[in-house]
């Protein structure tokens, strides 16, 4: 989860140093999209408390990497990746932002399934939450920008 936190944080720090209010607004939008999505995901994880695939089916699914301690549904890594990719794509609607960020977010989801830590439904739900939060946050940030910047 380094990139979903690091990118908006770095943008915000740079914006503050350069006194660039437009970039700071972008950083706030991207950062709050990720925070909202991850917050919703962790609430759902504990509400559903779904066992991880490698725990439920140890004879069929072999864990790659370290064991996870949180419940499986939905995928937090996928949620954060899609929230970041979507909010970056909304903020900077250029093919050279949209294509790599979408490929990266999809890669995160596939990797989580390949590692045996998530079911496809965990990843699809995480992706939907991430994308949804970024789009909803367009409207939330209109209000937030008035509070923070006016």
Predicted features by range, described:
Residues 10-18, 86, 111:
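Residue-level signal for alpha-helical transmembrane segments in multi-pass membrane proteins
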Residues 37-53:
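Transmembrane alpha-helix/helix-exit interface in multi-pass inner-membrane proteins
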């Amino acid at each position: 989860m380094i990139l979903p936190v690091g990118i908006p944080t770095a943008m915000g720090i740079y914006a503050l140093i350069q006194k660039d209010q437009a970039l700071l607004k972008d950083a706030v939008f991207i950062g709050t999209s990720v925070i909202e999505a991850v917050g919703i995901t962790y609430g759902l994880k504990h509400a559903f408390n779904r066992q991880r695939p490698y725990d439920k089916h140890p004879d069929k699914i072999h864990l790659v990497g370290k064991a996870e301690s949180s419940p499986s549904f939905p995928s937090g890594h996928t949620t954060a990746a899609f929230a970041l990719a979507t909010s970056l794509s909304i903020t900077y609607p250029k093919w050279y932002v949209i294509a790599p960020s979408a490929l990266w977010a999809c890669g995160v989801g596939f990797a989580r399934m390949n590692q045996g830590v998530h079911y496809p439904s965990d990843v699809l739900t995480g992706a939907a939450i991430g994308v949804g939060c970024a789009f909803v946050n367009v409207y939330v940030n209109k209000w937030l920008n008035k509070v923070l910047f006016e």
